[in-house]
Amino acid sequence: ETIINLNNYIMNKKEKLEQVNHLVQKLGLSPQEAVEYFSAKVVESSSVVRECEVAVGVLPGMYVYADGLISSEIIEGRRVMAVVGSVDGSDVLAVCLHEACLPWSSDWLEAKATQEMTGGKEATRKLLEISRKKRQEAEAAQWCYDYAEDGVIQGEAFLPSLTELEKLFANKAAINASLKALGAALLEGWYWSSTENGSNHAWLFNMF
């Protein structure tokens, strides 16, 4: 399974909205004048409000749109990028809509580096760094890193850690309900983690 971390994404949205608010104040515009301007540009004011609520209102199963909106509803005309998988304080993970059946490493890569890592993004990059140095394959990690579908930026997705897969499993029902509504692959079966288990093994997680 491929996931992305929404923390920076949400922070960027908040920063942009704060900049807009600062500009409105600097220009001496009233909130009504600002709304009228955006309405004239065919930007729904309700979308801005919903984006403001993202940081405190995100729940597992919500849809993450490529244009920046996070909503509990499927909105016609907008492209869904991922589904929120877990919300743990300020740590928000989202499940991408496509998956692949690949080996962890067809070369039996021994990275000996990710056993204690709880963050899949860091672990994925470490695995790929070592695989390049050793000139050995790390297919699952590489596929996740290269993922660039539905608006996901290449390099942002990663192979989740064992800890992160456990978080997704806790919210499996909500995630799968949204994935099913989109016609995407459900969280079912066995999934590789980026967490190593011993010298030449890695943890698998059963989503059944």
Each PLM stretch: what is its role?
Residues Y9, L102, S106, A141, ...:
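Short, low-complexity intrinsically disordered segments
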Residues L162-F208:
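C-terminal, surface-exposed recognition/capping segments
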